[in-house]
Amino acid sequence: MALTKKQRAELRMKFGSRCAYCGCELSEKGWHADHVEAVLRKSEQCMKAAAKGIFKLKATGEFYRPGADRLENLFPACAPCNLLKTSYSLEMFRKQVSLQVERGRKSSMNFRTAERFGLIEAVEKPVVFWFEQYQEGTAS
């Protein structure tokens, strides 16, 4: 759904001009309108690229879930959160966020070094999204 400038401005303010997920401040430009329930965009193979032996997909502009493409299903999100969330449900996204520390520990020598020197301290706690805190009035 293409948002008008007014709708986009209102959506940005939905949670106090912050990302619905991590709570970072959203500038006027550069943030994403995230479909909370994914619309799942349809794509097809680009035959022009295929003729050159390249596999490339292109969006058709259609959705597998067109009913999810509505204003009430949009949250303001920073680009990193929206790109990590992809088409996950909220609970699957929460799970993905909770796995990040262990993934960093497994795959990043920089993370392990910083942790060993006390520069990073992993904390076991549930992932609570900004919009949940905002709606409960506990956001700070």
Predicted regions located by residue number:
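Histidine-centered catalytic micro-motifs used for acid/base chemistry in nuclease
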Residues: 32-38
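The −1 position to Zn-ligating cysteines in a subset of zinc-ribbon hairpins
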Residues: 17-18, 32, 77
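Extended charged
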Residues: 1-10, 14, 24-27, 45-75, ...
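Compact nucleic-acid interaction/catalytic patches
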Residues: 39-45
